[in-house]
Amino acid sequence: MADAEDIQPLVCD
């Protein structure tokens, strides 16, 4: 997963 941080931020609870 390349830009997973942009697609799905780590703020997913």
Swiss-Prot record:
Keyword Nucleotide-binding: yes
Known role: Actins are highly conserved proteins that are involved in various types of cell motility and are ubiquitously expressed in all eukaryotic cells. Essential component of cell cytoskeleton; plays an important role in cytoplasmic streaming, cell shape determination, cell division, organelle movement and extension growth.
Miscellaneous note of the record: There are at least 16 actin genes in soybean.
GO CC terms of this entry: cytoplasm; cytoskeleton
Gene name tied to this protein: SAC7
Name the record gives this protein: Actin-7
Highest taxon of source: Eukaryota
Keyword terms of this UniProt record: ATP-binding, Cytoplasm, Cytoskeleton, Nucleotide-binding
Record bears the keyword Ribonucleoprotein: no
Protein family per UniProt: Belongs to the actin family.
Organism: Glycine max (Soybean)
Single annotated GO MF: ATP binding
Subcellular location: Cytoplasm, Cytoskeleton
